[in-house]
Amino acid sequence: VNRPHPAPDRAGRRRFLKIAAAAAGSAALPTRPAPSLSPRHVERDFLLGADTEIQLYHPDAQAARAAIARCLAEVRRLEAIFSLEQPTSALSRLNRSGRLADPPPELVALLGRAAHFSRATCGAFDVTVQPLWELFRRHFSAGDADVNGPAAGNIERALSRVGYRQVQISPEHIALGCDGAAITLNGIAQGFITDRVTEMLQAQGFDQVLVNMGEMRALRGHADGTPWRVGIAHPDQPWSSFLTLPLVGRAIATSGGYGTPFDASGRHHHLFDPRSGTSANHYRSVSVLAPDATTADALSTGLFALPPKAALAVLNAYPNVGALLLTTEG
């Protein structure tokens, strides 16, 4: 995963996605729903290190609240598996020891999906980039940091620990490839959790749903038949949207280096090219619209590290996926 997992980075990215969606979506909502329409239920929380939101329409408020509560409990359970902030999480234990026996099936499944997207993007998406993030964080945390970034030798040493092919995954155990290797799931876990919540609600009979767990996925639209409307944040003004899209039966994710810059110029940021070991700068942002949030999340991350021609080649393999690649030239 090219995006690091720690909470400050996740929170910044989630907030601009949430604000963009709220700003764009609020205009589509009637000020006072017609009496014949099901009421809208909105639940906001602080999960996965950032603000989250579930919106749904249903005539039974008690049933809606109970369903949302079950979903939030599931999010917390998955967070205890995927989190790097929780020292007892399955991922933290894997990174500490390099091996994990009897891993949770959700971790096995998610790493399997991640490996698929790594292969599909020729390694541009890689869950093992955490050593690069640690290197850049340490470098730019120093008061006299070289503005050009870490020394080439230090990047090479970090890169020697990066490589999705080194990770061994089975239902019985997961093993990292070498000492100092570490995994971050921040380029795919939010999408996975968004899908889990959406599918739980759908299984319980809720279909007019918009879920935001860092990535967004919608089922049917509003009670009045209008679609949900989601705004894509402007790279220079992340609190505002430069484009608003309808969202029904689809998911969307956006990646942008402006979300967590390491330096004032923004040239060094949290979206790494795991092949070069440096921040990718082909685009200001990449937004992906896909049937599910896991795909949207992973591809928005992986495509960010690919030049346009290579990115389009990847997209050709996904006929149900669309992308907006906002280049540095605008």
Regions found by a protein language model. Name each.
Residues 1-330:
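Mature catalytic core of soluble alpha/beta enzymes
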